[in-house]
Amino acid sequence: MKGIFLLLMLVMPQTHQAAESGNDDNSVFDLFELTGYNRKAGSRKPQGLHLVKGPDPSSPAYRIEDADLIPPLPEDKFQDLLDAIRADRGFILLATLRQAKKSRGALLSVERKDGGGHIFSLISNGRARTLDLSLSGERKQQVVSVEDAVLATGNWTNITLFVQEDRAQLYVGCNKMENAELDVPIQKIFTENLASTAHLRVAKGGVKDNFQGVLQNVRFVFGTTLEAILRNKGCLSMTNSVITLDNPVNGSSPAIRTNYIGHKTKDLQAVCGFSCDDLSKLFAEMKGLRTLVTTLKDQVTKETEKNELIAQIVTRTPGVCLHNGVLHKNRDEWTVDSCTECTCQNSATICRKVSCPLMPCTNATIPDGECCPRCWPSDSADDDWSPWSDWTPCSVTCGHGIQQRGRSCDSLNNPCEGSSVQTRSCQIQDCDKRFKQDGGWSHWSPWSSCSVTCGSGQITRIRLCNSPVPQLNGKQCEGEGRENKPCQKDPCPINGQWGPWSLWDTCTVTCGGGMQKRERLCNNPKPQYEGKDCIGEPTDSQICNKQDCPIDGCLSNPCFAGVKCTSFIDGSWKCGSCPPGYRGNGITCKDIDECKEVPDACFTLNGVHRCENTEPGYNCLPCPPRFTGTQPFGKGIEEAKANKQVCKPRNPCADGTHDCHKNARCIYLGHYSDPMFRCECRPGYAGNGIICGEDTDLDGWPNENLTCVDNATYHCLKDNCPNLPNSGQEDYDKDGMGDACDKDDDNDGILDDRDNCQFVYNPAQYDYDRDDVGDRCDNCPYNHNPDQADTDRNGEGDACSVDIDGDGILNERDNCAYVYNVDQKDTDKDGVGDQCDNCPLEHNPEQTDSDSDLIGDKCDNNQDIDEDGHQNNLDNCPYIPNANQADHDKDGKGDACDHDDDNDGVPDDKDNCRLVPNPDQTDTNGDGRGDACQYDFDDDSIPDAEDVCPENVEISTTDFRKFQMVPLDPKGTSQIDPNWVVRHQGKELVQTVNCDPGIAVGFDEFSAVDFSGTFFINTERDDDYAGFVFGYQSSSRFYVVMWKQITQTYWDTTPTVAQGYSGLSIKVVNSTSGPGEHLRNALWHTGNTPGQVRTLWHDPHQKGWKDFTAYRWHLTHRPKTGFIRVVMYEGKRVMADSGPIYDKTYAGGRLGLFVFSQEMVFFSDLKYECRDS
């Protein structure tokens, strides 16, 4: 056997390690390493311990100096350890230690975070020579001590502690200690949420219980067996006594597996090598072992042959007995021992005890080989003796003993022959040769037959507590001796039974004798599974209404058609209720007009109830074109009220019937529009909405050509400047490269930044008036006019035009030189015509307008009760906010407060063309919108599908070609105003210089509005503000969205310190001072400045804009509710989103663009849309 063990020692470590190499690293938890101590570079400096050399050179060893300073195991690692313990229902703990002599200390402990004591601790008690496991459950504490665990010797030793469920087994080195039993399973101590309430500490115990000495390789191990660990430690002789699943005495579970690689573990130690002599001896021993095994096999074969021979003899000779290995014939008698005789009777061995006679002598003895005592010849007659005394108690309490009794004789006067003592054998009871043993169950008996022959029953089996029978206070068997389980036979037959009789049916006649019937069903229960049918008849009948028939008053049909007539015995009659849809007494019934009495029974369109009355009843007309809904009909008021018609406008965007591209938004235009929806590519894409392609610069043109519908080019052609926004796609020289990115637009060899006619071929660069505009493109070549203003757009600049506005009146006699006004009306006689007078009724020739609200200071009172940007005396609806001041019938009353906007005599709530006069209300297709405004609601010649404000004739398309320049810091010697370059018919503006704060605000006014555009900084210089304004009412009152690249303090700290943070901001300006230094610094400042600016929202992520990067903003403003939301896209993704913000400071106003100290700002592909409807 020694040879086999040596061979296993050589082979097993290599195969074991090979199996382990593929495991994960959650099977071994090195407590020192998980706490943060190791010898790697960058690990923490040890606290409370000192690094020393241990017996394992591949792992660090630590001398414990102050266990209180050693940090606990991190909570997440402790939780992983708990999960492993609970999964395996136990653990294996390995530790190498050198403990101070006769000291007491904890190897590890789990202590409560709130200082409530220990939940688990492992303590080596050097004086008591024990290893103590202390456990604290919910209501119980237990201390389990493993005796003779001598660890505190001052020398190196190692321990292996195996805990499984409620059993614990300890090995000190290779020596197995006694097993210990826990009151509760270990997983009930290491609970699932223990890591949140307790710490695991190494070497930390209670008061004066900290470990004293050196520790190494303190590890919890999972995923292997105790046998594998002992084998790898060289403890081969112990492998048959470890706790395993196959050892039923220990009761452990099979949760521990057979691998042993884990959390950053070192390779397992292999068995030491062997010399050639050792191997020669090994094989010699194995040869000897083979000879021994062969001999044992021959002996077993011989014994088997003997047993077979005995079995044959017993079979051939009936009645024989086999006793103590000896075969006896029937009726043979033999002696077993000196006191037992046996007889064979028909294969049954019957033994009996020998009965011994009384011995009248004192020297009676039991000879060898005999059972009864004998007297020797020296005894004589009993003359002259006293009577015998009583027998003494038996000399033994069980088995064979003796009793004695005595008598007396006067030997001086009498011969006294005979013995004075008699002896006899005795046996109170047989000695109990049994031993204490617990009971064990026999095998289960076969299952009994089912307890029923049909239906549901049960079968039973039993077992007896006789394998073995419990004796000498041994434990009874645990569990039940009887077991039942259900059994199912074929369903039992069910005989049918009659159910209850039905009520008698109506008599066949009302008089004169008729018949009526009743029925019953064979269903209580119905026959099933070959059961018998019900006995008897299923029907019954009887005579009814035996009385004589009276005269029938209903024969003359006195009631209304369809009304029930009831006659009585005396000849009278009575009519029932009128049929549905009629009203009356039953004799006379009139049709009910449900359409009139239930005015909302059917859909009402433009004040017309689409209901038709019929006799009887009513029916609704089908829903109008572009509406969906039911077409109910019915009879009577109740049905008309309960089943009303609902017609809803069709919405392809909502019902999914649109054909927009997956990267496009479906925009619902209304059910009167044709088409009813528009597809618009999402930010980062461009196209016609049906097809969308990548759009890097977010200017609405794709990076590559798209295959749109035939002859469709808008937004389907490739972007001629794919990396620089140019929504107008201007290309003067038609070279395929847009002007925005073409360095020589006119191909005259002069680069644009030096070309005085950027779009006109002029290599000579002649410039007579020295205004930096070449003569070839100068609209006033002999007059200095660098701005090239041309009010009447006739090609002749204002600087050299004798009639700037083209109204036929020379400039020196024109009271509105820049506004077309043939009538030259001047109501206030101030020399400024009414068409351009900012106070047409107040004499103010200087035309001062301090707050840039287009109202001269002379007549500007800033009293605006509805906060819509129009002072009360100039507001066409002073008490109802209407920033757009729409008044389509020009009656001086705004549409918002006018009940007949087009003045055609039809009220707005019934007018099928609210903004276009059509007193005839002609609606050919019956869809609810009149022919006069079918596809152009405001009659501005722009179809609703293309109209940005389909309910405002004044606004049809996005256009910033005309705008008002508003400086916000107009004072100072070094004033630099913004320089705005307009492109793409007013849909793209570029601000080119580093300037003071200013706004380019358009003249269109809005209430509810959506405003979007592309933002692009085309320079690396500067890092300041740019953005846009909305709700503009004056230079002191507006909302502004402004964006800064980096956080920066404004250079001028007067009058206030202004700290501008990077990121997007939404602010409301309500300045008491107006444009100037106060407003300038307040705008720069991110935060609130009393009396100037209030910040509604600032991007919490403080993301600044990046150079040469396209962004797309989308503003939603609904003044009625105060809703404001700004979303900023970077490419396809949302970069910042303000979410819903509510502020009702201003009820609408104008839109514009904002800059503050930032040059080369591109505002491209600008779009605004009214959302008042």
UniProtKB/Swiss-Prot annotation:
Disulfide bonds join C174-C235, C394-C426, C398-C431, C409-C416, C450-C487, C454-C492, C465-C477, C507-C544, C511-C549, C522-C534, C554-C565, C559-C575, C578-C589, C595-C611, C602-C620, C623-C647, C653-C666, C660-C679, C681-C692, C708-C716, C721-C741, C757-C777, C780-C800, C816-C836, C839-C859, C877-C897, C913-C933, C949-C1170. Gene3D superfamilies: 2.60.120.200, 6.20.200.20, Laminin, Thrombospondin type-1 (TSP1) repeat, TSP type-3 repeat. Residues 319-376 form the VWFC domain. The keyword Repeat applies. Residues 838-935 are annotated as: Disordered. Keywords: Calcium, Cell adhesion, Disulfide bond, EGF-like domain, Endoplasmic reticulum, Extracellular matrix, Glycoprotein, Heparin-binding, Repeat, Sarcoplasmic reticulum, Secreted, Signal, Unfolded protein response. One of its GO terms (biological process) is negative regulation of angiogenesis. A motif (Cell attachment site) lies at residues 929-931. Residues 1-18 form the signal peptide. Residues 22-224 form the Laminin G-like domain. TSP type-3 repeats lie at residues 694-729, 730-765, 766-788, 789-824, 825-847, 848-885, 886-921, 922-957. Belongs to the thrombospondin family. Adhesive glycoprotein that mediates cell-to-cell and cell-to-matrix interactions. Can bind to fibrinogen, fibronectin, laminin, type V collagen and integrins alpha-V/beta-1, alpha-V/beta-3 and alpha-IIb/beta-3. May play a role in ER stress response. This is Thrombospondin-1. The lineage of its organism: Eukaryota, Metazoa, Chordata, Craniata, Vertebrata. The gene is thbs1.
